[in-house]
Amino acid sequence: MSKMSSLVSSLILAGSVSVASAWEALPNKAPEPANNPTTPEKVKLGQILYHDPRLSSTGTVSCASCHNTMLGGEDNRPNSMGVNGQTGGRSAPTVWNSAFNEVQFWDGRAASLEDQAAGPVTNPIEMGMKSWDDVVARLKSIEGYQALFEKAFGKDSISKDNATKAIAAYERTLITPNSPYDKYVKGNKNAMTEQQVRGMEKFAEIGCGGCHSGAAFNGPGMFQKFPVFSNGFFNAKYKFVKDKGRAEVTKKESDKNFWKVPTLRNIAITAPYFHNGSVKTLDEAVKIMAKMQLDKDLSKDEIADIVAFLNALTGEFPKQQMPALPATPGTTVN
């Protein structure tokens, strides 16, 4: 047995034992940092900023454009569209339950939701602002934001730091508890179907929980190489290894094709799948993961059972509605 096969076998065994003995329900409240306690005023401001396209250079792209809370927290596109019709090389991850991630972005380059909120605004492809100084100047020019920031942070408080704190505070309210799975592990054994229970058992048995662990099924703070096992057919078809992943951030060869483990919460409604959005169906994604991560060939029935279980991870979504944005009468976005 090769060292890699031995390692994967150990992960499978550890994953199947730990997951089977420690199924966790999703908390109703997300953790928050000491320097940014959640308040209703921050959440209100954050929701408005999140939906305001004027944080982009063209006035056409908001956070919600790619991470739509009216959907599964993303945009169901392989690659999201930013300013001037540009597209990036990665699929937008869901914002729902992102508060349970220890790091953000596919490559983990942001250590917090606050850090993450700062990035897309000045990304030339995504929202295209030249600098946060320009963002702050634009916010200060919109009269309604003065009062909103003052209620959330005090007088003369429009700043990059406070804007990102407000967006993060809003994102920490985007929690989807009470899925059939959550109800099941809390004791309601009728909450999941027999097929979903079989899929849950198979998920643990083959070692999926070696990476997708914890209440959010995201292996909090964990990076994993993908793919572990090379497969010429899948690689040629889906081009998984074209993007170097975390190595793009660290510049370390040892981090090549390593990725933050994504959440499986609400996975049934967040197609397409993988970092490049190349796989259209959940059935195909399960088949690929079993083969390329665990070196397992699953039958159609086993795939169907696991997919049924993953559908049981779709939670209850808090009601969302588009907020009224502060008006800028008589002016345009330049």
Task: Give the label of every model feature segment.
Residues W106, G128, R138, D156, ...:
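Short capping loops/turns at secondary-structure boundaries
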Residues L113, M127-G128:
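Mobile amphipathic helical/loop "lid" adjacent to a hydrophobic cofactor/ligand pocket
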Residues V121, I125-E126:
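Class I S-adenosyl-L-methionine-dependent methyltransferase module
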